[in-house]
């Protein structure tokens, strides 16, 4: 995209709403065949109208988080989790179409880039993150630390007349138990529980590796109140990169540090060396075990003790050599045993004497 085209491109709108006695005063809906969530209706005199929200606007971000690929319930949960104020980045249909033709990705940085002094080409500069003006990426970075501090959340709720107001499900593609949906105005919603959250703990007990029935039983065992430690998708991925299971210590304490590629390679090499050290004697153990088994099987045919007949020059460090010698010895002993079972030779004079008696 050329700089001239970017400079003349329309911009999205940032609407900051403060909740009134009757809420924010707008209705959200999804349209068939279109990705995303749209403003269906804006009530007259409402905080939404005062903030400049318009019917037909497409919702792009909620409090700096992109929601273009999220479900209706997920977007609603994000808005309600903001409590008394919310920041919505929206585009009207005409602006949305023009930005798509120009290949400009809709985000809040476009507005900050335009407001930055001495910035001749705001959209172009916003497109190249980390290049150009040094101040702009710093401003963008400053807007995310709160949102990017990925911590688990402790959701405490008391059972209402209709229960807690959330549904639990498991996903075959990934381990764990997840929140499928949260009912509006339910105890679960009031506690901050969101759709797609993964349950880590129930009432202080870790649920890692537990089955669906185990998690349900743990929740029911809490009676009319339960505490769920949960992580959203991004937080879950962060802790997996750190190789740490989230806990209540991470609610306010220091966060773990993700493994870098070098550290992962070092860790893998250490594990490989440890495994090699453990596995390296195994072939010898297998051979010696099979040798012992052969000795036991052969000993059934050769009762004599083996210690007295084993050659002293044989090295015990070579199980293969021991195995070959034991076979040879076994054959010799078997031959000796068969020979020892034969009847002694009788001379002809004794035979004649025996037959004459009969």
Curated annotation (Swiss-Prot):
InterPro entries: EBP50_C, NHER, NHERF-1/NHERF-2, PDZ, PDZ_sf. Its main location: cytoplasm. It is found in: Cytoplasm; Apical cell membrane; Endomembrane system; Cell projection, Filopodium. The modification Phosphoserine is found at residues 2, 46, 162, 269, 280, 290-291, 294, 299, 302. Residues 135-152, 348-358 have a biased composition (Basic and acidic residues). The keyword Membrane applies. GO terms for cellular component: actin cytoskeleton; apical plasma membrane; brush border membrane; cell periphery; cytoplasm; endomembrane system; extracellular exosome; filopodium. Residues 114-132, 307-319 have a biased composition (Low complexity). Residues 114-192, 277-358 are annotated as: Disordered. It is a peripheral membrane protein. The keyword Amino-acid biosynthesis does not apply. It comes from the Eukaryota. Induction: By estrogen. Detected in liver, kidney, pancreas, prostate, spleen, small intestine and placenta, in particular in the syncytiotrophoblast. SMART domains: PDZ. Homodimer, and heterodimer with NHERF2. Binds the N-termini of EZR, RDX and MSN. Binds the C-termini of PDGFRA, PDGFRB, ADRB2, NOS2 and CFTR. Binds ARHGAP17, EPI64, RACK1, OPRK1, GNAQ, CTNNB1 and PLCB3. Binds PDZK1. Interacts with CLCN3. Binds the C-terminus of PAG1. In resting T-cells, part of a PAG1-NHERF1-MSN complex which is disrupted upon TCR activation. Forms a complex with CFTR and SLC4A7. Forms a complex with SLC4A7 and ATP6V1B1. Interacts with TRPC4 (via the PDZ-binding domain). Directly interacts with HTR4. It is linked to Nephrolithiasis/osteoporosis, hypophosphatemic, 2: A disease characterized by decreased renal phosphate absorption, renal phosphate wasting, hypophosphatemia, hyperphosphaturia, hypercalciuria, nephrolithiasis and osteoporosis. Scaffold protein that connects plasma membrane proteins with members of the ezrin/moesin/radixin family and thereby helps to link them to the actin cytoskeleton and to regulate their surface expression. Necessary for recycling of internalized ADRB2. Was first known to play a role in the regulation of the activity and subcellular location of SLC9A3. Necessary for cAMP-mediated phosphorylation and inhibition of SLC9A3. May enhance Wnt signaling. May participate in HTR4 targeting to microvilli. Involved in the regulation of phosphate reabsorption in the renal proximal tubules. This is Na(+)/H(+) exchange regulatory cofactor NHE-RF1.
